[in-house]
Amino acid sequence: SSSTASQTSTPSTSVSATGTQSDSPEVQAEAAVVAFWAMRDQLASDPKQGVTKLSDVARDQALDVHRRSLNAQAAQGWKQVGMTSVTPQSATATDKPGEYVVKACINVSKVNIVDSEGKSQVPPGRPAQSSYAYKVQRDGEKWFVVQDLLEAKPC
């Protein structure tokens, strides 16, 4: 029918957790870090889900290090309560096409890690927020966090 043809010819913008195609690459790269932390929070809050979904938002070193961390928490019967707040600070292109370094302030002041009895396992003196640099890469229309060296700096 003609209505089908007109629907397929209408340009549409895909909206996802990693921004929209019309956003600048910098905005999309920053959104990838936000999406990564949202997924990590979800998996840490419900360890029964396993860590498979982390590969929807992360690859390479970042996937490995966070998968290990989540599995270690789950193995001890720990889970996360509360959500991480992520405030992107900057996105800078590297010399590799489609790759950015995103600096973001990660606020964990509302996050607790508890054991099976509900007792907090957060070390005393944990900073409420720290800035981290993430390497993010674009693959087609999707963005992935590929490197997190876990080097905390003040926000």
PLM feature spans:
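Surface-exposed, charged secondary-structure patches
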Residues: 76-116
